């Protein structure tokens, strides 16, 4: 998944960018995931608010905005900044950890370890490449490219290549590009592809060849340029659109391809399409209706709360129907 969220270009972009920066601090430095989720939810709700927010009290009327966040909004609106963020930015350790986690392959724990060793910048990482694993070296190599958002127009071209090459390998494959792209986003952080084949179910033996032959085909046409990791059901790598004539080169982009059993495919598509907030709301509604949903299955809950056998699913709509929830197109799944 992509490391960076798109900067908010909305009526309340300053507020949402502030909340996103706080969220990243809580995740990468404090490792307080509940606070990270709270800031993310508030930022998401405010981003969709159709009016310019004039006070914390106005923001507090929105779901997910509590007293503490409302107070921060008041401070930001009054001064144009936030003391807590100013402090974080001035703290060398916090800002260095936050920065290093932007390198693909470097999580909060690795970032903290590097900072403890005095490695705080890209230049420091380059001087200490022997301390980096394979994924981190690729992340460093393409740092500038991975920082750039992928415009929707490029994502559509990338999707065409992937879907066409997949069908060349075997016309029975089903592939879906998920993430914010499927929800209609104007830009994406990376490309997330789900793949299945009728011959592969949760009852089958493992079939890594189904994933690997697709990866090899995409390498053959020079779309996939680097491999970060290649397992039996998940490939993580780097791809690049081919240049047309003498046009400038396209940036390298992160791509993940997941092979999913056919009977679990649409639960996977639903989950990886998101958004996170939509998925949480849908899972909560499912529980109220006596079902449990995850990225693999939907199962009925018995009177004791124990989940039963997975229900058959042949489309995303089947999942909505089971829990008696009106079907929502991917573009309507922000919350």
From Swiss-Prot:
Binding residues annotated for Na(+) 1, in chain numbering: 60, 62, 65
Chain positions with N6-acetyllysine modification: 72
Consequence of substituting residue 34 to G: Decreased 5'-dRP lyase activity. Decreased ssDNA binding
Residues the record lists as binding K(+) 2: 101, 103, 106
Note on cofactor: Binds 2 magnesium ions per subunit.
Cofactor: Mg(2+)
Pfam families cross-referenced by the UniProt entry: DNA_pol_B_palm, DNA_pol_B_thumb, DNA_pol_lambd_f, HHH_8
First-listed, main subcellular location of the protein, grouped into a coarse class: nucleus
Gene Ontology MF terms in the entry: 5'-deoxyribose-5-phosphate lyase activity; class I DNA-(apurinic or apyrimidinic site) endonuclease activity; damaged DNA binding; DNA-(apurinic or apyrimidinic site) endonuclease activity; DNA-directed DNA polymerase activity; enzyme binding; lyase activity; metal ion binding
InterPro entries, per database record: DNA-dir_DNA_pol_X, DNA_pol-X_BS, DNA_pol_b-like_N, DNA_pol_B_palm_palm, DNA_pol_lambd_fingers_domain, DNA_pol_lamdba_lyase_dom_sf, DNA_Pol_thumb_sf, DNA_pol_X
Resulting phenotype, residue 71 to Q: No effect on 5'-dRP lyase activity. No effect on structure shown by circular dichroism. No effect on ssDNA binding
Protein name stated in the entry: DNA polymerase beta
Source organism of this protein record: Homo sapiens
């Amino acid at each position: 998944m992509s490391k960076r969220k798109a900067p908010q270009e909305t009526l309340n972009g300053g507020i949402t960018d502030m909340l996103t920066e706080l969220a990243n601090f809580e995740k990468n430095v404090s490792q307080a995931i509940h606070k990270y989720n709270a800031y993310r939810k508030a930022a998401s709700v405010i981003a969709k608010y159709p009016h310019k927010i004039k006070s914390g009290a106005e923001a507090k009327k929105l779901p997910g905005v509590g007293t503490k966040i409302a107070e921060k909004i008041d401070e930001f609106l009054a001064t144009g900044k936030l003391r807590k963020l100013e402090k974080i930015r001035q703290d060398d350790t916090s800002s260095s950890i936050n920065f290093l986690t932007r390198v693909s392959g470097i999580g909060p724990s690795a970032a903290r370890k590097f900072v403890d060793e005095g490695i705080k910048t890209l230049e420091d990482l380059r001087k200490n490449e022997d301390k980096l694993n394979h994924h981190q070296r690729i992340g460093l190599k393409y740092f500038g490219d991975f920082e750039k958002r992928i415009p929707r127009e490029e994502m559509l071209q990338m999707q065409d290549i992937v879907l066409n090459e997949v069908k060349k390998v075997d016309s029975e494959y089903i592939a879906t590009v998920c993430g914010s792209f499927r929800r209609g986003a104007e830009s994406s952080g990376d490309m997330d592809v789900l793949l299945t084949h009728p011959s592969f179910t949760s009852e089958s033996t493992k079939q890594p060849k189904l994933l690997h032959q697709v990866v090899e085909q995409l390498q053959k046409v020079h779309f996939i340029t680097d491999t970060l990791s290649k397992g039996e059901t998940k490939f993580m790598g780097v791809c690049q659109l081919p240049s047309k004539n003498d046009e400038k080169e396209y940036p390298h982009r992160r791509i993940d391809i997941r092979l999913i059993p056919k009977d679990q495919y649409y639960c996977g598509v639903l989950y990886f399409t998101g958004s996170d907030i939509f998925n949480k709301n849908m899972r909560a509604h499912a529980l109220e209706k006596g079902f449990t949903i995850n990225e693999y299955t939907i199962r009925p809950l018995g009177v004791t709360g124990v989940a039963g056998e997975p229900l058959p699913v042949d489309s995303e709509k089947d999942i909505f129907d089971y829990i008696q929830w009106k079907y929502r197109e991917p573009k309507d799944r922000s919350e």
